[in-house]
A protein has these predicted regions:
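An exposed, glycine/acidic-rich loop-and-rim segment of catalytic or binding clefts
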Residues: 1-275
Length: 275
């Protein structure tokens, strides 16, 4: 979809060779732009920019110059402000059935960010691998942190993701304030065992869910970050990336009345693995 680069469906085969759509979303374009969806907006499947996650106070300073950004969550800037890249119409080119190229030019000052930013995002599918490549250039110093926001439910007949197992290949995560603003301190999961996913854990064990950024150093090449699986149907999603962090959000605040096939999506209906 060239609206927000939305990933509407991802079909994979389960252990019985049945095709399963493993991401949350809607059946029609109209549902993605409906006002009631935007009121409690979970960013289903969308490209996020200019800056994924939160910026404290909606202000950034670059070269001693302060830029005031669009503030859209408790006085902070979430996912680049409103409207972000998730609500923009992208130019789309489809060379073949396995590749899609999206391009968007964000003008200088859009949502308060400095510089004209040219962004190209490439989607490709090959040998059961779905690949996302981000490219961006700007005519002046700026901040950019692009990400994707699909919510996975590997067994859509389940009302929630409690029976999914998650493994994360790191022992570190970012400390945050009560408003989920990073403090700049990297903590070890040894200090808070509820955050330790070095071994696969059922998500049902996370009583209050997760909305946290796990850190992976500064990789030069894509490295293994996460594995999400459902034991009953044999589907596993493996995440590799050269990003330094992976935001894990268990969808605590999802409340959508009319998802795919008219299904109600409530809290913990899907898990977002944002890279």
């Amino acid at each position: 979809c060239n609206l927000g680069g939305i990933i509407k469906n991802i079909f994979v085969r389960d252990c019985r060779w049945k095709l399963v759509d493993v991401v949350l979303g809607f059946d029609t374009l109209e549902q993605y732009i409906a006002p009631e969806y935007r009121k409690n907006y979970p960013y289903f499947g969308a490209l996020i920019g200019r800056y994924g996650n939160r910026i404290k106070g909606g202000e950034i300073t670059i070269d001693n110059e302060t830029h005031v950004l669009n503030k859209n969550e408790k006085g902070n800037t979430l996912h680049g402000g409103t409207p972000g890249f998730d609500q923009r119409l992208w130019d789309a080119e489809q060379p073949d059935n396995e590749h899609l190229i999206l391009h968007y030019t964000s003008p200088d000052g859009e949502n308060g960010f400095p510089g004209t930013l040219d962004v190209t995002v490439r989607y490709s599918i090959e040998n059961n691998v779905f690949r996302v490549i981000y490219e961006a250039s700007c005519d002046q110093p700026t901040l950019v942190n692009l990400t994707q926001h699909p919510y996975f439910n590997l067994r859509p007949t389940d009302e929630n993701i409690g029976n999914h197992e998650l493994r994360l290949y790191t022992s570190h995560y970012l400390e945050t304030t009560s408003d989920l603003i990073p403090t700049g301190t990297i903590l070890s999961t040894d200090q808070k065992h509820a955050f330790d996913f070095n071994k696969p854990l059922f998500l049902a064990l996370q009583e209050d869910g997760l909305d946290d950024c796990y850190t992976f150093g500064d990789p030069i090449e894509p490295q293994l970050m996460a594995e999400l699986s459902h034991p009953k149907n044999g589907i596993t999603v493996t995440i590799l990336s050269d990003y330094p962090g992976l935001q894990v959000y268990m969808g605590k605040y999802i409340n959508v009345a009319n998802g795919k096939g008219g299904k109600h999506y409530g809290p913990y209906s899907g898990i977002a693995l944002e890279i």
